[in-house]
Structures are given as C-alpha cells and as structure tokens.
C-alpha cells in the first residue's frame, strides 16, 4: 500500500477536545472523523475504541496517554488530540506535548459545566490555547429548550470568567453518539461544528513567520574568524548580515551581527525554524556568549526573573519526588538548554504541593532568562526531573 501524499496546499491547524470526564470528548472525536470521511471520502473514520485505547507516550519523563487523529475539512487539514484521562490532559497541556491552536470544549447538555470543565478552561488560559469553540453534547437527551439555553449561558459565563470572549464563542448543540450512529440530522451538527472551527480558529502563524530566536547550545571560537554559537532555530528566519541580540543570564543584552550561517559544515544564505546551525558572530569573544542564552531578533524578547507558572509535579511512579514541597523550595529550572536556580512561592491557601498535583506558583530566578508567556520549562532536583511547567504571566 503506497503512502498517501501529504497535501500541503491546505492550511494546517492543531486542535483537541477538552472537557469533563464522560461528557463525550472521545465520542465526538470519533464522530468528527466518521462524518467527515463519509461526506468527503477523504480521511479515515476512527472508532471510539481505537481512540480510547491510546498508547502511553513519554514526554520529558512524564507518562501521558494521548490519541492523535487527523482529518480534513474543505479548507483545512487538522491534527487532533484526545486524552483518555483528566490527568493526561493536565500533563499534556503543561508539557506542550500537543500544542493546540484551538480547542473544542465538550460540555454535556444533560449535566452542564462540571469541575473539570472549569479546570480545562483555566488550563487553556494558562498554557495559551488561544481559541475555544463549544460543543454542547447529548442534546438528544434534553427536551427542554430553556434548559439548553441555561446550560449555554453557564458555559459562556464560565469562559468569560477566564478571559475568553464568552459572548462571541460559537456554541454548537449536537449529539456525538447520534452522529456516530449515522443519524443525518445530528451529522449535520458535526458539519456545523467543523465549519465553526474552520471559521473561528484563525490559521496559526507558523514558526518560520515569527521573529527569529535560537537557544544557544554550544559556543566555540574559530581562529581568525570569530565566535560561533550553535543551536536549533526555534522560530523565524536568520539571514547572513542580520543583527541579533544575545539575551539571558546577564542584565544587559548584547547586540551583534551574524556574518555567517552554517549547517552540516556548509554555508547557507539563511536558516529557518527547525534547522540546526552555527551562527558566526561579529566582534563577540567566546566569553560573551554561553549556553542558556538565546540569539533573537532585537527587541522581540527580554530577560526576566519573576513569573507565574502552571506546573505539574511528577508522581513518585513517574520518578518524581516522594514527598511534598512547600513555599521557598529552591530547585533548578531548566529552560531550553540550561538550569537556573529559582525560589518558589505557593498561592495563598496552598500549604504544600504533593507529587502528582498541578498548581499555579510564583517563581523568582537568581539570573534573568529570555522568557515569555507560553515558555516551557522543567523543574529539576539533583539532575532528575520533578516537575514540568509553562510560564503563564511575567511579573518582572
């Protein structure tokens, strides 16, 4: 069987289903693949069991079960993630194992918003899922129109509470199970949902279009030529002759010009996101640039020491701590390529954090690092990972 060619002409977006346990996330995922495959003849219908039996993956030492499915509408190609358990969602969103350009929030019309509905909305806000579309599921079980309107209002209020535009978010009423069973009236609702996703979730800006940034992994001198910083370009493009800033670990950023770009010992005119390169830096001594700093387009990223973060603390079984920790705990924070010591403050009313918990915390690093909202990090202690986090907001 020849492999199908990936169609690049369509724009691509990463999305996922979120919401309370048993509200129908996986059934909806199966229904989307089934209805779209049936209507367009493209893509593969996935059964509930195939999605639900997702294999475990390890992301930064953390065990996560995630199902990845793909499907396409007339306008777009989608990669869709669905997680079986609540803990898997928390881990997935915090580690960025599956970056989402948007999410489908599934709420059972029969039950209304539940604790995990709230928690997933909060997580989406914290980790930077920019857009949510709501699927009000199990509407076939609710005869009362007023009740549906009440649930919809509740969901909209909840979204607004976490700074999503609750009044504008599309809410589609449907039944994933009925659609999956082939009921034409409910199949239409799946088509309606995907039209809303196509329309409401903007085409994501690809990494190559963003401002240039490369974490420095290694530095060496070439006699007679200068200093070379190596690393993998995280985003954007770098052209020979571009001015860049060296940021992090020092109070002051230093400006320099890139006089050469090499990949696999060959000279390039430019490098882009995903390339492993060496950048030759004009007028910079080997001592002035080090692992843990980043090269970036001037003015696009600044070094910070204080931030709020959403963190998942590894369980004992995942190789994490065996005991809780408290405020003023001082582990290492591993950003991109380096460790920096940081001091943790827990929120008011949170006495301690147990292994396996997720928590919002404030961190103060002892040296400034190039960070922004959405930057991922690991928390380490004696060389082993004890937590994973994402910067939710910069304080200083």
Curated annotation (Swiss-Prot):
Coiled coil region boundaries: none
Residues of the tr-type G domain: 10-205
Main location per the UniProt record: cytoplasm
Region (G4): 137-140
Gene3D superfamilies, A to Z: P-loop containing nucleotide triphosphate hydrolases, Translation factors
Annotated GO CC locations: cytosol
Catalytic activity: GTP + H2O = GDP + phosphate + H(+)
Enzyme Commission identifier(s): 3.6.5.3
Family in the record: Belongs to the TRAFAC class translation factor GTPase superfamily. Classic translation factor GTPase family. EF-Tu/EF-1A subfamily.
NCBIfam families on file: EF-Tu (TIGR00485), PRK00049.1 (NF000766), PRK12735.1 (NF009372), PRK12736.1 (NF009373), small_GTP (TIGR00231)
Subunit structure: Monomer.
Name of the protein in question: Elongation factor Tu
Provenance organism: Halalkalibacterium halodurans (strain ATCC BAA-125 / DSM 18197 / FERM 7344 / JCM 9153 / C-125)
Gene responsible for this protein: tuf
